């Protein structure tokens, strides 16, 4: 299914359809303009996505195109090697993912890099995820990159820290800023080896 950028109008098999409310099966491709996709976490809405006033069902993937495209409506985002998955649909070339409320972002089994922006905001590759409260980084050698004045709060649990109101788990590295310990007993380790300046392990 090829979006047209006009409500209720799509193209498929070289046929232009107008006044369409529903389309079933397959994949969706966006326009060269700004496309807005909506999904839901409600039961029974898996593999459904809405765009241009059309409800697409049993969809496996959405390729948005080259613009500031958005997807909204979910609180569960799962990173892929490229793009991400939500509601059973793989999304590619999305610039912004807007959560409806406190959201969880899950990393891959490979090394992921998370760039902190504002509060509850994480950038992965070319996608900004908004209203995120939890990030489960995954099994790879994962890192979080903050601003020069980034504040990292230890949790007292291995590989788990808090930053920008986001609880990160399964994290191996954090870059930039300052570190604040817990109310418990914290152990910090440094090294005199060359190339380890400004590094600390906790």
Where are these regions (language model features)?
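Acidic, glycine-rich low-complexity segments
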Residues: 1-202
């Amino acid at each position: 299914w090829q979006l047209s950028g006009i409500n209720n109008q799509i193209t498929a098999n070289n046929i232009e359809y107008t006044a369409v409310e529903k389309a079933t099966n397959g994949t969706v491709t966006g326009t060269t303009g700004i496309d807005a996709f909506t999904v839901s976490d409600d039961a029974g809405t898996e593999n459904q996505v809405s765009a241009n006033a059309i409800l697409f069902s049993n969809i496996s993937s959405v390729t948005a195109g080259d613009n500031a495209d958005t997807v909204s409506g979910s609180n569960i985002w799962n990173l892929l090697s490229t793009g991400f998955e939500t509601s059973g649909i793989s999304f590619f070339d999305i610039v912004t993912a807007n959560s409806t409320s406190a959201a969880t972002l899950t990393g891959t089994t490979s090394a992921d890099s998370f760039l902190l922006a504002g509060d509850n905001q994480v950038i992965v590759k070319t996608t900004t995820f908004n209203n995120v409260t939890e990030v489960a980084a995954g099994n790879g050698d994962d890192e979080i990159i903050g601003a020069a004045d980034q504040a990292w709060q230890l949790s007292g649990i291995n590989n788990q820290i808090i930053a920008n109101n986001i609880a990160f788990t399964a994290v191996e590295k954090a870059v930039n800023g300052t570190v604040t310990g817990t109310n418990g007993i914290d152990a910090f380790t440094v090294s005199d080896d060359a190339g380890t300046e400004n590094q600390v392990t906790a």
